Design a protein with these regions (language model features):
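Short, structured segments at the rim of ligand-binding sites
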Residues: 1-436
Length: 436
């Protein structure tokens, strides 16, 4: 188990370029299974979750070539479906929640999809019902093996259908779209997720020959086609990383420029950080954050009540950045209510921040009130463990702003979502050491 030793309290300076979007990568990589032609993907992040998925695809029989940093070609012209029943696949699939995304492509192209109950972050219940309800509506037969915790779907030929999703699940929407592109007839998905990740997947599929309409809306129409061709696709910058670096700059009162952010795909993210009092300047496609030497002040609502930041389906605020907002608010002037609607365990890392001196009231598993300190006294260094990707990066930011040397255990959780995090922070002047 790896460990980070962080000497906090240092001002950082410089520029940083966000990695490719993790959540998009996990989807578009699975889409290569939909064709026997070569697919080339650029800007793939070098992180644990993505590398595990690439390994899984290779074990399934996908021919993979690394063409350069972040660029790979994939050709799924000799898939070994029997691998799905192997103990090795069971182990691989359990270790990666993103493995659920292979089911739609395999089901529509080969007539079978099989997956063990996936792993991932321990952040509460994360149901897979949306995925399998969609496959069933397309004509698949579903079975769940309670003894081995495995899901399977089979179908001779999927048929298009109308469906109203119970929840606007990002991965559920994408999985159903991938299953529907080769189905017979027309599929209509209402209450579809419309995050940039889903939009990018749809654009990639259309480039491969799919017929998807309504991209960017919550009403998606897919006219099935007989086959898909190859394509070249570039993954967007990771908006979660961009939000993390904005929070890092504010908490450490550092001057940082975030390069090539893909501003048009950031949605409400910049606005939320501005409501926390953080100022920045858009320069072409870069974000320049000045050193907040005088701190930052949370904006109340116009009636004087305290600000609430809550997650919501796109174009609402992504739940993956609530932990960053929470930690940034600990050193702001003012108060904010954080409302995590989607997951009931994502706020359970705040005890570590309280140990560091933060003033936070956990109202219930979904809500916490943060009373900002306004940099009147720095957070205190401490020992802590990273429970998941997003809490891990929030604790790392807290440690970089704290006085003294902090230790973070279980940093593999951070590595799952952030590429070369310690090396990139060192380039900004951070005092961080990785210990094996």
């Amino acid at each position: 188990m790896g460990v980070f030793k962080i000497e906090g309290g240092h001002t950082l300076k410089g520029s940083i370029t966000p990695q490719g979007a993790k959540n998009e990568a996990l989807q578009v990589l699975c889409a290569v299974l939909l064709t026997d032609q070569k697919v080339t993907i650029h800007n793939i992040p070098d992180i644990q979750d993505v590398n595990k998925l690439i390994s899984l695809l290779e074990n399934l029989g996908v021919k993979i070539q690394k063409l350069g940093k972040g660029t790979y070609s994939f050709q799924a012209d000799d898939i070994n479906i029997d691998y799905l029943k192997s103990e090795a696949f069971h182990t691989e699939g359990q270790a990666l929640r993103g493995s659920i995304m292979i089911v739609g492509p395999l089901l529509t192209r080969f007539g079978v999809g099989y997956i063990p109950k996936p792993g991932g972050d321990k952040i509460g219940r994360r149901r897979l019902d949306t995925h399998f309800d969609g496959f069933i509506k397309l004509g698949a037969h579903f079975e769940y093996d309670e003894n081995n915790f495995t899901y399977s779907v089979v179908a001779k030929k999927l048929k298009g259908s109308y469906m109203l999703l119970e929840e606007a699940s990002v991965t559920g929407t994408s999985n159903i779209i991938m299953a529907a592109v080769l189905a017979e007839g027309t599929t209509t998905i209402y209450n579809a997720a419309c995050e940039p990740y889903v939009q990018q997947l749809c654009r990639m599929l259309n480039a491969m020959g799919a017929d998807i309409q309504g991209i960017g809306s919550n009403l998606i129409t897919i006219n099935g086609v007989e086959r898909l061709e190859g394509c070249t696709h570039t993954i967007l910058p990771d908006m979660i990383e961009i939000g993390s670096w904005i929070g890092l700059a504010a908490m450490t009162r550092s001057e940082i420029t975030i390069k090539n952010v893909g501003w048009e795909h950031l949605g409400i993210i910049p606005t939320i950080f501005q409501k926390l009092g953080i100022t920045f300047e858009k320069k072409n496609d870069d974000i320049h954050i000045p050193a907040h030497t005088n701190g930052y002040e949370i904006q109340n609502y116009i009636d004087g009540s305290i600000l609430t930041v809550a997650d919501a389906p796109w174009p609402g605020f992504t739940p993956d950045l609530l932990s960053i907002v929470l930690v940034v608010a600990t050193q702001a002037r003012g108060e904010v209510l954080i409302h995590q609607k989607m997951f009931e365990s994502r706020l359970f890392f705040i005890d570590k921040l309280i140990d560091m001196g933060a003033k936070i009231i956990l109202c219930d598993p979904h809500r916490a009130t943060v009373i900002g300190n306004g940099f009147r006294s720095p957070l205190r260094a401490t020992l802590m463990t990273s429970p998941d990707i997003r809490a891990g990066i929030a604790l790392l930011i807290a440690a970089l702003s704290a006085k003294g040397t902090s230790t973070i255990y279980n940093i593999e959780q951070i590595d799952r979502g952030y590429e070369n995090i310690d090396g990139r922070l060192k380039a900004l002047g951070a005092q961080i050491v990785r210990v094996s």
